[in-house]
A protein has these predicted regions:
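Conserved active-site histidine-acidic residue motif and adjacent donor-binding/catalytic loop
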Residues: 67-73, 200-201, 210-226, 239
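Short alpha-helical segment that forms part of, or immediately flanks, the ligand-binding pocket
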Residues: 223, 246-251, 265-266
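A charged, aromatic-enriched C-terminal amphipathic alpha-helix characteristic of glycosyltransferases
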Residues: 279-285, 289-321
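N-terminal strand-loop element at the rim of the active site
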Residues: 7-13, 20-72, 201
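Short hydrophobic beta-strand element within catalytic cores of glycosyltransferases
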Residues: 255-259
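Acidic donor-binding loop of glycosyltransferase active sites
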Residues: 82, 227-241, 254
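Donor nucleotide-sugar binding/catalytic pocket of nucleotide-sugar-dependent glycosyltransferases
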Residues: 109-110, 117-146
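Conserved catalytic-core segment of nucleotide-activated headgroup transferases in glycan assembly
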Residues: 139-208, 212, 219
């Protein structure tokens, strides 16, 4: 079966990581053929979050076809003999569909406007929030294998306590969490506490113990980044409808430190008591500065069930027979 996977642009963020994983394991696990449909990087100008490295990663692995308008998608479907179109989208009806094949819509934020032959969501939270009952095709959680870290490269002592995160560039935006990072990272009383950020916009005054790194598609580098950390310091206002970065840290048995309440609560639902929670500056400050007291074993956390086999078996149930 030939399946096309569509996103309206390719970025370093979780939606396109998810799309890549589905396309990859559609071939590796289900034995189908995968192609990618998206818009041309060079025609998108300064569209938010697009990244040439993401395009190059997809181009290296899959045939990639570009559309400008909706009829172009149907032309690609007809020309390439595509039987199923899997579309990652927010969830609303915006006309993006192919009327000449079977469509699986994969909703990332809401599920209130059903369309396509299968209208699904990435986590049960979306059903709860949208007051719907659509099928759930979850994202899968995958990390590369590596035992190495970045401590020597980043001049971080082996015995230092390191908190880190990666996400969208603007997605470390809870004020009191940023203030904790700034205050501890600049306080000489805590010379052994470091903070590292991958693909996060720089904030606060410069400090040798607060390090900002560019985004990457290199899975081994991301695994080394995770291995460098004692824990993930989550800081996105609004929360997650799945939380792929939380999943990747959790697969590596790294505790996730996060705010106790968010609008989008999928990461809280999945991790439950395995998440180390706070509600204000003082609570987080105490967690970070007294880390050995708060560290916990999270080796049986809820993200570990989202293996490629588990997810692709669900995905396969919704393919046309």
């Amino acid at each position: 079966m030939k399946i096309a996977f569509l996103s309206n642009k390719l970025t370093l963020r979780g939606t396109e990581i998810s799309l890549y994983n589905f396309a990859d394991y559609n071939e590796k696990y289900l034995g189908n053929t995968s192609v990618i449909i998206t818009r041309d990087y060079y025609k998108l100008g300064n569209a938010r979050d697009i990244h040439i490295d993401a395009y190059n990663k997809f181009l290296k692995r899959f045939p990639v076809f570009y559309y400008v308008e909706q009829p172009d998608i149907e032309e690609i479907v007809a020309r390439e003999g595509i039987e199923v179109l899997f579309i990652e989208k927010a969830g609303s009806w915006e006309g993006l569909i192919a009327r000449n094949c079977f469509n699986i819509i994969h909703c990332v934020f809401s599920a209130r406007q059903p369309h396509g032959q299968v209208y699904s969501a990435i986590h049960e939270f979306i059903n709860e929030d949208s007051q719907t009952n659509v099928p759930i095709i979850p994202n899968m959680a995958i990390v590369e294998e590596s035992s190495e870290d970045l401590r020597e490269e980043l001049n971080i002592p082996k015995d230092a306590i390191v908190f880190g995160t990666y996400s969208g560039k603007e997605c470390f935006d809870i004020d009191y969490i940023r203030k904790v990072v700034e205050d501890i990272g600049s306080n000489p009383a805590f010379p052994n506490i470091y903070f590292i950020f991958l693909y996060i916009e720089q904030f606060g005054p410069p400090s040798d113990r607060i390090k900002f790194l560019p985004g990457t598609t290199d899975g081994i580098y991301k695994r080394k980044f995770i291995n460098t950390c004692n824990a993930m310091l989550y800081g996105r206002d609004g929360g997650e409808t799945f939380g792929l970065s939380c999943a990747e840290f959790s697969l590596c048995d790294k505790p996730v430190i996060g705010r106790a309440e968010e609008h989008s609560r999928a990461h809280l639902m999945i991790l439950g008591d395995d998440m180390i929670k706070h509600t204000n500056y003082d609570e987080l400050y105490e967690i970070v500065t007294q880390w050995p007291k708060h560290n916990k074993d999270v080796s049986n956390n809820g993200y570990k069930k989202y293996t490629p086999a588990y997810v692709m078996d669900i995905f396969n149930q919704y393919l046309p027979k």
